[in-house]
Amino acid sequence: MGGIILTSPGYLELLRSNKTFARLWGSNMILYIGDWFTVLAMFLLAGDATDNSPLAIAGVLAVRSFTFAPLEPITGMLADRYPRKYLMIIANLFSFVILISFILTGILDNLFSVYALTVLLVVGRAIYDPAGTAYLPTICSEEELLTANALISGGWSASMGIGAGLAGFVISDTVGKQA
């Protein structure tokens, strides 16, 4: 019926030909791996703070979900009004400073602190996600978008296993040495 047929580049071709996207994808992989590492650590910290209460551990996931929901419409408007690249950088720096502050002060031994850190990290992520999604069409051509979205989505899925696996390895190694 006369529709336009777009041909998408392959994954490696896109990463080689679009350096801006390749940098974004690489930084997203680091971000996603760190996120999943942190999520698993938050589950374990909630368990440690409560003698492994399943309710407290599930609370981390609930806090993440219930924090994202009301924030994303607001942060989506931010992504429409301000430079997306800078919002992404600010969001990551905010999350880094918050995480390091909590770690260095050693206050993650109670459930309230674990939940507070979870909320603050989600705030950073709620700023980053809509900005990143809106930024993608500005650095990729229409033909590249299908492949770019597939790489971003696949990277997120792969990072879940990598980040959680690394966290499990590091945490079990640390706990094993303390025992």
Label every model-predicted segment.
Residues G2-A22:
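Juxtamembrane intracellular "pre-TM" segments in multi-pass secondary transporters
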Residues L12-L14, T105, I127:
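Short secondary-structure boundary/capping segments
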Residues N18-K19, N52-S53, N110, G176:
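Short loop-to-helix capping motifs
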Residues A22-V39, V60-A79, P83-I98, S113-S172:
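Substrate-agnostic recognition of the 12-TM MFS/MFS-like secondary transporter fold
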Residues A41-A49, I103-T105, I162-A179:
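Transmembrane alpha-helix termini and helix-breaking/packing motifs in multi-pass membrane transporters
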Residues A41-F66:
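Extracellular/periplasmic helix-loop-helix junction of adjacent transmembrane segments
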Residues D51, P83, T105-D109:
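Helix-breaking motifs and short loop linkers at transmembrane-helix boundaries and internal kinks
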